[in-house]
Regions:
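Generic solvent-exposed, charged/amphipathic alpha-helical segments
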Residues: 37, 79, 134-138, 142, ...
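Short, well-ordered alpha-helical segments
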Residues: 72, 76, 127-135, 200, ...
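A short, structural micro-pattern
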Residues: 103, 148, 177-180
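Extended mid-to-C-terminal alpha-helical interaction segments
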Residues: 161-162, 166-224
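N-terminal low-complexity or simple alpha-helical regulatory segments
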Residues: 1-110, 129
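Conserved helix-adjacent loop modules within structured domains
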Residues: 107-162
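Short hinge/gating elements
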Residues: 59-65, 116-123, 192, 211
Length: 224
């Protein structure tokens, strides 16, 4: 409790009369998140993933890709980093071919399989968790290239849930369930977008994380 009160928030969520439904600024939420992440030593963004993400992993991933020239290079290098990290556990990753340019001017960006993200018994019930993981990664890609990453469609392995509208609002495009892969379908030229950031701007981004990964942009109605 002392850890939370030391953040000097505009409200005290631990007070007896606190209204837990009160909206707070995303930057205050980010402060709370960073403190909880430090206490738990887990950077999984509170998504309920099957495995803990050790503190510092996201920073190392960012440093690993920040000097890539294009988004495609960054996506491929990020997959290498994720695969390497998973070899340190007892669960080898099936995340082997992240980017595929198709013959019709589009491309697929594949995410890890459902069983790499959540427990085998939770695959269909965790469709929201998987979708939010993908949405956060999309926002990170948008930060890397400095502009929106427009999607043609999103593919999810999980069966269709009852709340289809939530997923369409989250991504702003068609969402297909029961697919072979968890993937983004996007225009091929998006892969050639240059990365615009440096290690200096990355450090500022990390100081404010996860703010830019959770809060919608002005023209985006897909807040998590």
């Amino acid at each position: 409790m002392l850890q939370l009160r030391s953040l000097d928030l505009p409200i005290d969520p631990l007070a007896a009369n606190a209204n837990l439904d009160t909206m707070i600024d995303g930057r205050y939420y980010s402060q709370i998140y960073r403190r909880v992440m430090w206490l738990l030593q887990d950077e999984s963004f509170g998504l309920g993933l099957d495995r803990r993400t050790p503190a510092g992993s996201f920073r190392m991933l960012c440093l690993f890709i920040i000097h890539c020239e294009t988004l495609e290079q960054a996506l491929r290098r990020a997959a290498e980093f994720i695969n390497y990290c998973r070899t340190l556990t007892d669960a080898p990753s099936s995340y082997r071919r992240p980017v595929e340019r198709l013959s019709d001017g589009t491309a697929l960006y594949r995410f890890p399989e459902n069983t790499d993200l959540v427990g085998a018994s939770d695959i269909n019930s965790a469709s929201t968790t998987i979708a939010q993981t993908m949405a956060i990664w999309r926002r990170f890609c948008q930060w890397l290239i400095g502009k929106p990453l427009d999607l043609i469609a999103v593919h999810l392995q999980a069966d269709a849930p009852a709340r289809l509208g939530y997923f369409e609002q989250l991504f702003g495009c068609e969402v297909h369930f029961g697919s072979e892969h968890n993937a983004f379908l996007l225009a091929e030229y998006c892969l050639d977008c240059p990365l615009i950031h440096t290690e200096e701007s990355l450090q500022k981004f990390l100081r404010n994380a996860p703010y830019h990964l959770l809060v919608s942009q002005e023209d985006d109605d897909s807040s998590l």
